[in-house]
């Protein structure tokens, strides 16, 4: 993310580190939208307002220039794309309500719960698991911002603070199952959810064998809230994301826009012809072209490919641009990776297509 790009979206900037303010000052000639520069450091550099002096001089109440509406932008995330600069995902004030399902149902939280989500604060997943849905459910939230991840440290925190609910990417659980779990008292842990990447069945089975806990998978994007999930009342199918969240009209479609049948692959889409559902983003900020590419004619295209079984469960294949096409077959990297992960010598693996003159890839 370039300083120029970031400043181009802002009306006011607040920074404290001198090395950052130097970059900001250099970017100002190409950032006409910035009207105010504010320093929160001990001394305001030339051209910056002093934040602390401004607070002291400010009136106790200032009437807003315009009343807020549900449609106003409440927060924005950066999300990387496969090409070009990162996209800025804008959500409106209905976004937190979209996470009621996340906290109360997928995380299965009660007022007595102590929930831990492992995600850096700057990620969209942080508010998925540390803020909106959990607070709406009235649950307690345990925040652990580790400088360096170690499986032992996570297990110690669960033991010492009696964490009851844990949400983390599958990679975290891949490390946990290689620890000696008998060294820790994990009796408080009741429920575990995973998101951020597809779950290999081997990890599901091993963790269940060691702890007795089933990993409940979920799928969503920075642009959405929980979109597909295995809920508490559902029987998980290892490797499957689960069923669509009822708050979204989820479908799988082929390149011709046709809804696919069971066993067929299709892109995961959200139909919005009847209205924008709670939790779906408002737009890619100041980028009408990218917004239209992803969301047009009453359909939001996630860019992710899956297939569904006879029970309606969705199985992740990969990004639409990551699917390997070989000899006329469409091969999902996750399927091959899951097979490799069953070997005890394999901790992590990644599959990608290589150009081939005969097979295509």
Language model segments and positions:
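Conserved pre-ATP/AMP-binding loop-to-beta segment of ANL
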Residues: 39-46, 56-78, 85, 108-114, ...
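Gly/Ser/Thr-rich phosphate-binding loop
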Residues: 53, 136, 163-168, 177-237, ...
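Structural core segment of the AMP-binding/adenylate-forming
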Residues: 1-53
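Conserved AMP-binding/adenylation subdomain of ANL enzymes
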Residues: 97-114, 121-164, 179
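Conserved ATP/PPi-binding loop(s) of AMP-dependent carboxylate-activating enzymes
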Residues: 247, 258-293, 331
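AMP-binding/adenylate-forming catalytic core of the ANL superfamily
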Residues: 1-6, 11-18, 166, 290, ...
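Conserved loop-to-beta-strand segment in the C-terminal subdomain of adenylate-forming
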Residues: 32-36, 264, 355-361
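Conserved AMP-binding A3 loop
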Residues: 74-98
